[in-house]
C-alpha cells in the first residue's frame, strides 16, 4: 500500500506502473 501512485489515465491510480 504505497502512496507513490502515478495517474496515467484520468481517475486511474496505478501503483507505480510506467
Curated annotation (Swiss-Prot):
It comes from Periplaneta americana (American cockroach). This is Peptide hormone 1. Keywords: Neuropeptide. It comes from the Eukaryota. GO terms for biological process: neuropeptide signaling pathway.
Amino acid at each position: 500500500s504505497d502512496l507513490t501512485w502515478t495517474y496515467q489515465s484520468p481517475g486511474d491510480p496505478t501503483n507505480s506502473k510506467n
